[in-house]
Regions:
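Extended non-globular C-terminal regions
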Residues: 320-489
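Juxtamembrane amphipathic/hinge helix adjacent to a transmembrane helix
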Residues: 294-336
Length: 489
């Protein structure tokens, strides 16, 4: 079913088989969280001749034998190895799993440019470092990725056959453009934004962003997921409005099934995008969902001991029941304006034209006053009016002023609506009413423009006609102009 927003209501529903997120395999006894004391080592990893990064290794103290290991991949909002994943990586280490959290390479990473294949190569260097770390079993080394990092991990698992397992948490699955269309529509709807504003979301997100860079917005990990042949654990927070929590999991299940991989476990937690509780937003200091790390560790220890799809004594899909309002569209089409660069250019031209018209209005008014002083007596004797410019300056100035204010107010409103949507604040009735005021103002501007055009048309070429004739023509033109505006509207 197509929703009023232009995106499609989600129909790929996932039904959990149990509310219990616990993970266990029959016949396998695994070390649990807290079984070991841990230690940290800060190391440097050389990515190439010019770039090196820092990393943090956490490992269990006194664990016997070669241990399973896990490399962590950053999401979009993190980069420093000392500031992220500390609680998750430490918990894993206490369950006997060696972990490595590297810095994100930032010299080739920005808001406008991201090269995911290159990032996969860089993480591959860290993966090799972890595989050869003392006490690590190279055959039991896998990946943990969140959000944007899951796009990168999907490239790694497609290109390398030595990845023992893959954990995908808060995975977008679809391209960034498609994910943003779904997320923005959901955010705006939940914040109470006007319906007409929500309808324009897909038109904006589907624009050509090449004027700003942003080519990575089109990266789609779906083809890589069909090469996921190792055990996979998929995690989503049911409070995460930014991700396709049902559609994403179903897509992963479909893609792995096409590769003959049935060892895919899915868990849903009452948590946000970062698997934390206390707020739907990603805020510092929020606690992890209480069972999250324990389930991660039990799953890793089980699959690295050889657990297959038939060995699980717990359901493959479990946890809180997910609810995804809109589907991430498989394709998006822009409106009349297909390029963000063109849109920004038109906005700039509109503001520039307003300023130019304002200067013209001022010039017409000043020139008219100067000329009228010398010809006033002659015009009064002949009963004639000057043609172009008579009475135009004031309405032209008003039109320019209102147009500029209306454009700026609209940009402010859209920006404010986006801020409220992203902060999950519901718009007040008064704020929502501003949109109605802006729409009424737009109608008034169209009428004023029609009136102004009719005045100009009636005045051009009639400088030698009498005052009474001019006024009669203007009345006729005004009526025709208003009728045209109504018909066009």
């Amino acid at each position: 079913m197509t929703s009023p927003t232009g995106v499609t209501a989600n129909t790929e529903h996932v039904t959990v088989q149990s509310p219990d997120t616990g993970i266990a395999a029959s016949g396998f006894t695994v070390p649990h969280e807290g079984s070991y004391q841990t230690k940290e080592s800060r190391i440097t990893i050389r990515l190439n001749d010019a770039v090196s990064i820092h990393a943090v290794v956490r490992e269990p103290i006194g664990a016997s034998g070669a241990r399973p290991a896990c490399l962590f991949l950053h999401g979009a909002g993190t980069g420093d190895s000392s500031e992220v994943y500390g609680d998750v990586a430490s918990a894993m280490a206490s369950a006997g799993i060696v972990t490595l959290v590297p810095d994100k390479r930032l010299d080739n990473y920005s808001t406008l440019h991201r090269d995911y294949p290159q990032m996969a190569e860089d993480y591959g260097r860290s993966f090799d470092t972890l595989k050869h770390w003392p006490g690590v079993d190279a055959q039991k080394t896998g990946l943990y990725a969140e959000s944007e990092g899951t796009w990168i991990s999907s490239i790694i698992t497609a290109n390398r056959k030595d990845v023992a397992f893959s954990i995908l948490t808060s995975a977008p699955v679809v391209s960034g453009r498609q994910q943003m269309t779904m997320a923005a529509s959901t955010y705006f709807t939940d914040s109470g934004a006007p319906r007409s504003l929500i309808n324009d979301v897909p038109k904006l997100t589907s624009m050509d962003f090449r004027a700003l860079g942003l080519e990575y917005a089109n990266f789609d990990s779906t083809p890589y997921l069909s090469k996921l042949t190792q055990p996979v654990l998929v995690n989503y927070g049911t409070g995460d409005l930014s991700m396709p929590i049902a559609q994403g999991a179903q897509t992963i299940l479909n893609q792995t099934a096409s590769a003959g991989n049935s060892n895919v476990t899915v868990r849903y937690y009452p948590a946000n995008h970062q698997m934390r509780t206390g707020s739907h937003l990603s805020r510092p200091g929020l606690p992890l969902e209480s069972s999250y790390t324990r389930n991660l560790e039990d799953w890793i220890n089980s699959v690295t001991m050889g657990a297959t799809a038939s060995d699980w004594s717990t359901p493959m899909i479990a946890g809180a029941q997910p609810s995804q309002r809109y589907s991430a569209p498989t394709s998006v089409s822009p409106g009349l304006i297909s390029s963000l660069g063109v849109l920004l250019t038109l906005l700039g031209l509109a503001l520039g034209a307003s300023v130019l018209c304002g200067l013209c209005a001022a010039g017409v008014g000043i020139n008219s006053r100067i000329r009228s002083r010398g010809r006033r007596s002659q015009q009064e004797e002949s009963g004639r009016l000057p043609g172009f410019g008579q009475g135009i300056a004031a309405p032209l100035t008003l039109l320019v002023s209102l147009s500029t204010l209306s454009l700026l107010a609209t940009l402010w409103y859209v920006g404010s609506s986006a801020v409220q949507a992203l902060s999950l604040h519901h718009a007040s009735v008064a704020f929502s009413g501003v949109w109605t005021v802006l729409r009424v103002a737009a109608i008034i501007l169209v009428l004023l423009f029609g009136w102004l055009c009719s005045s100009v048309i009636a005045g051009i070429g009639h400088a030698n006609r009498s005052s009474a004739q001019i006024r009669q023509d203007i009345r006729i033109a005004h009526g025709s102009g208003h009728q045209a505006v109504v018909l066009l509207g």
